[in-house]
């Protein structure tokens, strides 16, 4: 990678040219094969990179600059269009290689099903893994119209994998009644509507544990993030999400990886959704990578 590519919009701003020297690897997962409403999130990773050139490199939230963190933007995984299972297998294989290389994986989606193979790779490396999940939707279905590979299923899958007591969902305001009932019955940690305040209560309980954080951009109210596939009114503000990212940064949990998914820029001609997403990525880089 040439030096000037760090400001080209082809990679996330200020990306380091060396994979070997970088602690973090940013990678895209341009998949939206299973969405139930509006497609387009496969274009999210590229647009987040493009608009990142408008970011300041300094975070007043964390008093750090991007210069202080070495991260490499690997581009997008070349997923086979329309083949969900093969795409998921490729994501799991790639993330497993990053973990073997002792990298911090930071994924850009893409629909939320892309998180499922990441969860599997993470659980293999970290037996005591916990999940922090911020989203408008429960994502607790076993299947959608008979199809188990759906963006409405990844949190149910990870509950079955690591135990529902190790999964913490915040900002939830949409889902089937049966999903909410199931979460309550099995002891999953599901917090409706809000993110920051319940998160502050949970973080001390997770001190010292390896935690993977997955953020669906639709946790935000559509006024703050119209560019997503399945809009849900009544969400949180971009400030609350920023404050939540900072709260995690200031906690004693061990964040071992993260993703930001469901940005669909085609529905947001002002670019406010990918612009917000790029800022969230900046704070994740500066706050979560130790």
Swiss-Prot record:
<feature type="binding site">
    <location>
        <position position="112"/>
    </location>
    <ligand>
        <name>Mn(2+)</name>
    </ligand>
</feature>
<dbReference type="InterPro" id="IPR020855">
    <property type="entry name" value="Ureohydrolase_Mn_BS"/>
</dbReference>
<feature type="binding site">
    <location>
        <position position="139"/>
    </location>
    <ligand>
        <name>Mn(2+)</name>
    </ligand>
</feature>
<comment type="pathway">
    <text>Amine and polyamine biosynthesis; putrescine biosynthesis via agmatine pathway; putrescine from agmatine: step 1/1.</text>
</comment>
<feature type="binding site">
    <location>
        <position position="218"/>
    </location>
    <ligand>
        <name>Mn(2+)</name>
    </ligand>
</feature>
<keyword id="KW-0479">Metal-binding</keyword>
<feature type="binding site">
    <location>
        <position position="137"/>
    </location>
    <ligand>
        <name>Mn(2+)</name>
    </ligand>
</feature>
<keyword id="KW-0464">Manganese</keyword>
<keyword id="KW-0661">Putrescine biosynthesis</keyword>
<protein>
    <recommendedName>
        <fullName>Agmatinase</fullName>
        <ecNumber>3.5.3.11</ecNumber>
    </recommendedName>
</protein>
<keyword id="KW-0745">Spermidine biosynthesis</keyword>
<dbReference type="InterPro" id="IPR023696">
    <property type="entry name" value="Ureohydrolase_dom_sf"/>
</dbReference>
<keyword id="KW-0620">Polyamine biosynthesis</keyword>
<comment type="function">
    <text>Catalyzes the formation of putrescine from agmatine.</text>
</comment>
<feature type="binding site">
    <location>
        <position position="216"/>
    </location>
    <ligand>
        <name>Mn(2+)</name>
    </ligand>
</feature>
<dbReference type="InterPro" id="IPR005925">
    <property type="entry name" value="Agmatinase-rel"/>
</dbReference>
<keyword id="KW-0378">Hydrolase</keyword>
<dbReference type="InterPro" id="IPR006035">
    <property type="entry name" value="Ureohydrolase"/>
</dbReference>
<dbReference type="GO" id="GO:0033389">
    <property type="term" value="P:putrescine biosynthetic process from arginine, via agmatine"/>
</dbReference>
<dbReference type="GO" id="GO:0046872">
    <property type="term" value="F:metal ion binding"/>
</dbReference>
<dbReference type="GO" id="GO:0008783">
    <property type="term" value="F:agmatinase activity"/>
</dbReference>
<comment type="similarity">
    <text>Belongs to the arginase family. Agmatinase subfamily.</text>
</comment>
<dbReference type="GO" id="GO:0008295">
    <property type="term" value="P:spermidine biosynthetic process"/>
</dbReference>
<feature type="binding site">
    <location>
        <position position="135"/>
    </location>
    <ligand>
        <name>Mn(2+)</name>
    </ligand>
</feature>
<dbReference type="Pfam" id="PF00491">
    <property type="entry name" value="Arginase"/>
</dbReference>
